[in-house]
Each structure stands twice: as structure tokens, then as C-alpha cells.
Design a protein with these regions (language model features):
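Short, well-ordered beta-strand elements within core beta-sheets of diverse protein domains
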Residues: 9-15, 93-98, 209-216, 332-337, ...
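Residue-level signal for inorganic ion chemistry
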Residues: 27, 49, 221, 258, ...
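Structural helix-boundary/capping segments
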Residues: 33, 111, 161-259, 264-266, ...
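Short helix-loop capping/hinge segments that flank enzyme active sites or metal/cofactor-binding pockets
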Residues: 69-89, 248-261, 302-357, 369, ...
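Acyltransferase
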Residues: 20-25, 54, 246, 271-294, ...
Length: 449
């Protein structure tokens, strides 16, 4: 059962050929089997998940099918508030924190009948791309347990990749959905800034924070996005923009114009990733009407750190010892950026977001490698100095948080050592339907799920 896609499992559930209880039990058994090695979950909602599954089974048997997520086990990154369930942010500071309200995306998932199976491990407070710095221990890559799963949504990516859940919700401030998706061989989508509510999600950098799905294929990604996307009038960053039928859009056959962004995204690539990109570009050429080389505007670099410090200053000033070494050092470094530099960077960010749409005049979509390098070992990650400059694997993902553009990572090959490689595709604001449609075409052409 764990190898089924959301779409496949949903069809079987709707036709009453399998039960939500059996599906959930299968995931719980997989968690019991694999989580001691992978460390993808911080909290497994065992009893609650089974109760949700039994409720879903009763409704479906009575003919009250809520939609494609009804009865499907879904995981949540452990900085997304869940009423009555620990939400730790992978930090000693919040090790016993229990929210009283659900995040908006949790409310939407519950309304859709999803079975929330547990809270997933991450980089402490989501600041970093390894998931090796967690109060609850590092997340291990399913393809090589000595290597990082990526981050900060590493637990979510690893859980989906191993069938511990059918999909997951992560957050992405500099690549934290797309980079672990690439490292774990799955699909990860960062929607347009404001497309998915962040209310009830512990912030990292509010100007750059996005919430998005991680799934094993593009169809499942579309189904999960359909449920969590939409305006939230209580979230000041939420965009009031129309929602497309994302699953239906996958069947639309077009040949878009593709923009290849060479600098700096194709520079200093690992040789095996470079080879995978060459092969992917050949396939993209067959799926597109034109392929051009495109330049993107530079992005300001002094936005994230001051915003992170602003979020944490009240905790850090009183309880610095409750932060892990990596997070503690990063917060100390953040104090070096003065207020004027931040204000100027924030103004530049607004200008970049207003102007970046111009790059889509000659093209419809942009393509880059998701990461320039494969995942490093957990030991290497732990030995690294806490500096954003050292996280080369986030170089290609970070700019798209600044742009706010919808961006997806999909599998496009493996290294000789069997480590997954990701292809990154981006489109104009609120073009998720077209983006998913093209990602689906690539997925089908390369026979990857």
C-alpha cells in the first residue's frame, strides 16, 4: 500500500476497495520500521491518526467522500501548529510547546478529510539546508543514511520518499522544500509568495517564507496544493488570487518557451549533476517550442538574517542556551546587519519582485538545476561553520524566494552512487497550473514517478 500514489490510493478509497484504517496502519508500520534509522518524525500521532482514519472510513462508507485527500495519511513539518499536539520547531526551546489552535493549512487539510499522521523533523527553526542541526537528531537520507536529507524540510522529504506518509507539507524560505525534495528523489513545490497561508506556521523570515507540498509525483503535488492554496483574510501576506484546478491542468498539452538561466545556476556544478542537466535539457527541447538563455536580476542579501533575529530576539536574549550551536551562532551573526541595511534590502526586494515578471516576455518558464552538488555527509554538515555562504546546495533555490515566483523541483536522474538529482522549473506569479502541467509532461516523458 505504501507504494501507491495519492491519486491511486484515493481512487481505491472512493471505490471502497481499501480502507483508510488499512492505509494509515500501513504507514504507521512503515514509520515503526524505518523511523529509528531515518529519524524523519519527531511526533507520531498514532492514536489520533487511527481515530481520524476510522472517521474517514465511516464517512466514505456512508457515501460522504470529501475529495482526493479523504483518508490519505499526510505529514506536517514540525513548525506548523497543531492544536493539542507538540510543535517543537526541532528546538529545545519549544520541546514541550503545545499550540491551542491549528494553522490555517491544518484546518484546510482536516476539512478535506486528510489523516494527519505526525510531525516531521527539520533543521532547528528551519534555518539551514541540512536537517543535521535538530534537537532531536539529524534526518538521514533514505538513499544513503550517512548523508543529509536536505533541509530544512528534511524529515518531510525523507518520510514521503520512504512511504511513511503519502505527502507532506513543508516550508521554504531559501529552498527548504525544493532542496530536500531533490536530495530525496521526490517532487517539491514552492508556490507563489502568498498563494498558501502561513498563519499558524512559526516564521523564519516573513518576507521570504512560503508553504508547499512534498509528494512522490506531480499529480499528488497538484492534489495537495489544491487543498492548501487560497486566500486567508487573517493572513496579511496571503494573496487574494483565483485558484485553478491543478489536477485538470496536467492534461493540458502545450509547448512552452523555456528560458535556461546559466549564471550562476549552471556554474561550478558537480560533474554528474552537469551530465544529468545535459540529458534533461535534451528532453526539455523536445517538450518546448523554443529554448533561450535568460538572465535574472540579482537579489538582496540582507533581508533574511535581520528578520530571523527579529522573530527570535525575545527568546534569544533570555534563553540562548536553549538554542543549538548552529542556530545560536547564526543569531549572533545576524546582529551585525544594521537596521538601515535591512530597510534598503527590503526596499530592493520589493523592486525586484515588481520587475522580475519582465523576464517572462520572451519565455514562459525558467529552468535550472535544483542544487549544484549532491548531498554531503551528516558528519560534514555537523562540522561546517554556521555560515550561509557555506551552504552551496541552496545557491540555486534561494533567489526564487526573493522573486516570490512559483518553483518546483522534480527528479531528473541519479549520480553513480545512486543519489537523486533534481531539476528546478519556475514560472510567473500564480502560474502553478502551467508549471505543474509542464513538470508532469517532463515526468511522463522521463518515466519518473
Amino acid at each position: 500500500m505504501n507504494e501507491l500514489s495519492i491519486a491511486e490510493a484515493s481512487d481505491l478509497l472512493r471505490r471502497k476497495q481499501i480502507s483508510p484504517v488499512d492505509l494509515t496502519t500501513s504507514c504507521l508500520n512503515r514509520i515503526e520500521q524505518l523511523n529509528p534509522t531515518i529519524n524523519a518524525f519527531i511526533t507520531v500521532m498514532h492514536d489520533s491518526a487511527l481515530a481520524q482514519a476510522r472517521a474517514a472510513e465511516t464517512e466514505i462508507r456512508a457515501g460522504n467522500w470529501r475529495g482526493p485527500l479523504h483518508g490519505i495519511p499526510i505529514g506536517l513539518k514540525d513548525l506548523i501548529d497543531t492544536a493539542g499536539v507538540k510543535t517543537t520547531c526541532a528546538s529545545a526551546l519549544f520541546a514541550d510547546r503545545i499550540p491551542t489552535k491549528d494553522a490555517e493549512i491544518v484546518r484546510r487539510l482536516k476539512r478535506a478529510g486528510a489523516v494527519l499522521i505526525g510531525k516531521q523533523n527539520l533543521q532547528e527553526f528551519a534555518w539551514g539546508g541540512t536537517s543535521a542541526s535538530s534537537y532531536f537528531g539529524p534526518v538521514h537520507n533514505p538513499f544513503d543514511v550517512d548523508r543529509i536529507a536536505g533541509g530544512s524540510s528534511g524529515g518531510s522529504a525523507a518520510a514521503v520518499a520512504t512511504g511513511m506518509c503519502f505527502g507532506a507539507i513543508g516550508t521554504d524560505t531559501g529552498g527548504s522544500v525544493r532542496e530536500p525534495a531533490a536530495f530525496c528523489g521526490i517532487v517539491g513545490l514552492k508556490p507563489t509568495y502568498g498563494r498558501v497561508s502561513t498563519r499558524g506556521v512559526f516564521p523564519l523570515s516573513p518576507s521570504l517564507d512560503h508553504v508547499g507540498p512534498l509528494c512522490r509525483n506531480v499529480i499528488d503535488t497538484a492534489l495537495l496544493l489544491q487543498v492548501i492554496a487560497g486566500h486567508d483574510k487573517l493572513d496579511t501576506t496571503s494573496a487574494d488570487a483565483p485558484i485553478d484546478s491543478y489536477a485538470n491542468a496536467l492534461q493540458v498539452k502545450t509547448k512552452p518557451r523555456i528560458g535556461i538561466v546559466r549564471a550562476p545556476f549552471f556554474e561550478d556544478l558537480d560533474t554528474e549533476i552537469e551530465h544529468a542537466m545535459d540529458e534533461a535539457l535534451k528532453q526539455l527541447g523536445q517538450l518546448s517550442s523554443d529554448v533561450l538563455e535568460i538572465d535574472l536580476p540579482s537579489t538582496p542579501g540582507a533581508v533574511q538574517a535581520p528578520e530571523v533575529y527579529a522573530v527570535h530576539s525575545k527568546y534569544f536574549s533570555t534563553s540562548p542556551e536553549l538554542y543549538g550551536p548552529w542556530m545560536r551562532e547564526r543569531l549572533k551573526q545576524a546582529t551585525a546587519i544594521d537596521r538601515v541595511a535591512y530597510i534598503e534590502a527590503r526596499q530592493e526586494l520589493d523592486r525586484v519582485r515588481r520587475s522580475v515578471g519582465d523576464v517572462f516576455s520572451p519565455v514562459d518558464l525558467l529552468v535550472t538545476p535544483t542544487t549544484p552538488v549532491p548531498p554531503i555527509t551528516i558528519r560534514e554538515a555537523m562540522d561546517m561553520s554556521p555560515s550561509p555562504a557555506g551552504e552551496l546546495w541552496l545557491r540555486n533555490t534561494r533567489p526564487f524566494n526573493a522573486y516570490g515566483l512559483p518553483t518546483i523541483s522534480i527528479p531528473c536522474g541519479f549520480t553513480r552512487a545512486g543519489l537523486p538529482i533534481g531539476l528546478q522549473i519556475s514560472g510567473p506569479n500564480f502560474s502553478e497550473a502551467n508549471l505543474l502541467s509542464f513538470a508532469y509532461a517532463f515526468e511522463q516523458a522521463t518515466r519518473r514517478r
